[in-house]
Amino acid sequence: MSNFFENYLRQVDDIETVSFVGRVQKIKGLLVESLGPQCAIGDLCLIDQRNGKKVCAEVLGFNGPYVSLMAYEGFSGIEVGNKVYSLNKGLEINLSDELLGRVIDSLGRPIDNKGSFLNNSYKELIFEKINPINRSIFEDQILTGVKVLDGFLPVAKGQRVGIFSGSGVGKSTLLGMIAKNSNADVNVIAFIGERGRELNEFIEHELGEERLKKSVLVVSTSDESPISRYKGAYVATMIAEYFREQGKDVALLFDSITRFANAKREMSLSLGEPPVAKGYPPSVFVEIPILLERSGFNGNGGSVTGFYTVLVEGDDFTEPVADNIKAVLDGHIILDRDLFDRGIYPSINVLSSTSRSIHRIMSLEKQKLIMKARNLLSIYKDYEDLIRTGIYLKGSNKDVDFAISKYPKIINFISQGINETFDFENLEDEIKEILS
C-alpha cells in the first residue's frame, strides 16, 4: 500500500506552496528591472501584460534588490507595477526521438504546424562539462558529401570546423550540401540570427523531405530578442548532445556563430559591461569556447561534429570574433569571394583552409596526394598574374608548366553542383588521375 502512495507523495512534494512575486520598476533598453521576486540567474519569470497575458523572461543579473530580466518575445504591454512571477527553474526542453523531423524555436516549442510533442521528457538547459580525459582522439572520417572537403580537407568525427566568409559567398548553401549528403546519423541544424525567409528555402530546396526525417531544426531569426538567439544556440547544442549519448554520430550545423556572438554582445552591453574589442565585451570571448567545447566525443561511442559558419565583417579575417573562433576550432574552411565571382562553387580556398585531423584519419599515401595538390595550387597562385597577363612563357619552368596543365582539372574537381553527388570509393583514384 505504501508503494501505491509514493508517486502521489512525490507529486505533492513538487508543488510550490510559496509564490515569489515582484513588481516591474522600469524598462531600460533591452532590460526589464523589477523589485523582486526571489530568484537565481538563469531562472525563468513570467511578467504580466496589459492584455492579461504573460511574457516569458530570463534573469540575467542583479543590481542590489533589483532583478534584471530580458524578455524572450519583446516588452509590448508591460507597464511599471506589473507583477513578475518566478518559476524557480531555468529553461526546459523536450529531449526525445520525437524531435527528429521537427522544427522548434529557441524555447524548444514546435513551430512547424505538426502538433505538440507527446513525450514529456523535459530536461533543464544545464550542461555538464566533459572530462578532457574522456574525449577520444580523431580516428574516423565523417563523409560530408562535398568532394573538395572529403578529398582535400577531410573532417573527422567529433571535429569542430569553422566555415569563414564575408556575406553572400555561400556559407548557408554549403551547410545545406553537408546536411543533405553527409553520412551522419542525425543532423541538428541551428539557424541563429538569420533571415526568416531562408528556413523554408533550406528545407525544400537544400535539405529535402527525406533528409528532414533525420534532422532537427532549431530556429531563432534575426528579428527575435538577443536572449532568444543566445538560448537557441544552447538548445541546438543540447539536442545534439542528447543524440550523442545514444551512441549516434551527429552533425551539428550551426548558422551562424557570429550571430550568437552578437546576441551575447547585446545582452552584455545591456547589463553595463564595457566593450573592449570593436564593441565586444570580454564575456563574448569567454562564451565562445564554452559553446564550442560542447561538440566532440563523450567517451560513450557517440560524437558531435560541429560545422559553424562565421560571418567575417568586411572580409576582414582578423576581426576579433573570427580570430577568437579560429583559435578554438579544429579546422577552418575559407570561402573565397574571388572564386565565387568566377563561378567556382563551392568557393573553398584550399590553400587558406586547413583541417587539423588529416594526419590522424588519412593514410600516408592520401596525405601525399593532398600535399601534391596543394603544392600545385600554390605554384599556380604564385605565377597567376604572370600567366593571366601572358608574360609567363611556356617552358620557362617545368614545375610551373605542370601546375598550369593541372590547374583546370583541380578546379573542375573542386566545383560541385548543389544536388551533385559522387562515389567516395572512387575519390582517391580520381585525385590520382588528376595529379598524374
From Swiss-Prot:
Coiled-coil ranges per UniProt: none
Enzyme kind, highest EC tier: translocase
Keywords for the protein's UniProt record, in alphabetical order: ATP synthesis, ATP-binding, Bacterial flagellum biogenesis, Bacterial flagellum protein export, Cytoplasm, Hydrogen ion transport, Ion transport, Nucleotide-binding, Protein transport, Translocase, Transport
The enzyme's E.C. designation: 7.1.2.2
A GO molecular function held by the record: proton-transporting ATP synthase activity, rotational mechanism
Cellular component GO terms held in the UniProt record: bacterial-type flagellum; cytoplasm; type III protein secretion system complex
Keyword field contains Ligase: no
Location (main, coarse): cytoplasm
Cytoplasm among keywords: yes
Annotated InterPro entries: AAA+_ATPase, ATPase_alpha/beta_chains, ATPase_F1/V1/A1_a/bsu_N, ATPase_F1/V1/A1_a/bsu_nucl-bd, ATPase_T3SS_FliI/YscN, FliI_clade3, P-loop_NTPase, T3SS_ATPase_C
Any one of the GO BP annotations: bacterial-type flagellum organization
Its biological purpose: Probable catalytic subunit of a protein translocase for flagellum-specific export, or a proton translocase involved in local circuits at the flagellum. May be involved in a specialized protein export pathway that proceeds without signal peptide cleavage.
Family membership: Belongs to the ATPase alpha/beta chains family.
Name this protein carries in UniProt: Flagellum-specific ATP synthase
Organism whose genome encodes this protein: Borreliella burgdorferi (strain ATCC 35210 / DSM 4680 / CIP 102532 / B31) (Borrelia burgdorferi)
Lineage, top ranks: Bacteria, Pseudomonadati, Spirochaetota, Spirochaetia, Spirochaetales
Protein encoded by which gene: fliI
